[in-house]
A protein has these predicted regions:
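Conserved, well-ordered active-site substructure
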Residues: 160-181, 233-285, 290, 295-327
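Short glycine-rich loop/turn motifs
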Residues: 104-109, 187-188, 241-246, 320
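Active-site-adjacent helix-turn-beta-strand microarchitecture at beta-sheet edges
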Residues: 155-236
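Structural recognition of the beta-strand scaffold that forms the well-ordered cores
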Residues: 111, 147-151, 191-192, 200, ...
Length: 327
């Protein structure tokens, strides 16, 4: 019985040893498999990361793709929209050949990015009496601390003395009627900005303009572009050239002020069709002709940038009012 008991103990011990060895071998295989799998996963992720890095590099390499995020409708649109971040305006040199003729013209376009800064300023002596008088554009600019100034509405030239004192038709300044002289032959229309800073072209009275929210306006014409439609597509119409002035606005709100020198060696002048075509090229949605001829003038910081011509008179023409860009 003792021998049997001893044998049983030995067998039990051997059994435990075999079980322990089996567990150890099984666990070791599992550990090896786990380590192997982990290595394979690590290698796979490294390969994937390498591929992702290659793809990302190809996407963000602007030089390789030659990608330009800013798109323009045409070269004129690019000329308007290319500017420094803090630039309130820019001046573009304009030159070309008249439509239907072979006359060279030159001038300037002022591009104003904030339409709320575009206002009407008047001569200190403008009024509706015989002793009213105008001022040259540079003086109007100085008196109103303007960055840019351009002649605006016409005037009644009594006795052909060019004193520029009595404005033609309604003049509205800061939402109020400044003058509204009617002689009976007014043939233009309102050219002005409303309180939403949109250029409005409409034949209406001064009172109607105030009722429709016009803040600054003069009376003149003809209208060049109305709601995107060029009014002078017929090249045989109004081909007479001289100094010209116009104002327009793009759909994005940018204001365009345009002057073309006339009756001079460097610039014969432009027609209404030319002015409409220039405004159309630069994206004007609405645009109108203003007083031109010897009145055509533009200043930058009170200095003339175009070449005003006043016939054979010694002085630059006096004006009743001007479109200005405030500081």
């Amino acid at each position: 019985m003792i021998l049997i008991g001893d044998k049983m103990k030995i067998l039990i011990r051997i059994g435990f040893i075999l079980i322990f060895i089996g567990i150890f071998i099984f666990s070791f295989d599992k550990v090896q498999a786990y380590i192997k799998d982990t290595k394979e996963v690590t290698i796979t992720n490294e390969e994937k990361n390498a591929k992702l890095e290659d793809v990302s590099y190809n996407i963000v390499d602007d030089n390789e793709l030659n990608y330009n995020p800013q798109m323009y409708a045409n070269k004129y649109d690019k000329e308007i929209l290319t500017r420094d971040n803090n630039e309130d305006y820019k001046i573009i040199k304009i030159q070309g050949t008249t439509i239907g003729a072979d006359y060279h013209y030159e001038g300037y376009m002022a591009v104003i990015y904030d339409p709320s800064k575009v206002k009407i300023a008047k001569s200190t002596g403008a009024g509706i009496t015989e002793n009213s008088y105008g001022q040259i554009l540079s003086d109007i600019s100085k008196n109103n601390n303007a960055v840019i100034a351009m002649n605006a509405g016409g005037f009644y030239d009594q006795n052909w003395n060019s004193n520029g004192g009595i404005p033609h038709g309604p003049v509205i300044i800061d939402g109020k009627i400044d003058t509204d002289y009617k002689r009976g032959d007014e043939g233009g229309g309102i050219i002005g900005f409303n309180k939403e800073n949109k250029l409005v072209l409409k034949r209406m009275s001064a009172d109607q303009a105030i009722a429709e929210g016009i803040r600054d306006a003069v009376d003149w014409g003809p209208y060049l572009i109305v709601n995107g439609k060029n009014q002078f597509k017929d090249v045989n119409y109004y081909t007479w050239v001289c100094g010209r002035t116009a104002i327009g606005q793009r759909k994005d709100g940018i204001v365009l002020m345009l002057v073309i020198d006339g009756l001079q060696k460097h610039s014969k002048g432009a027609s209404y069709a030319d002015m409409a075509a220039i405004m159309e090229k630069y994206g004007a949605y609405n645009a109108s002709n203003l007083d031109g001829g010897t009145s055509t003038a533009m200043t930058l910081n009170h200095q003339y940038i175009n070449s005003p011509w006043n016939g054979y008179r010694r002085t630059i023409r006096w004006l009743p009012n001007a479109w200005i860009m405030e500081k």
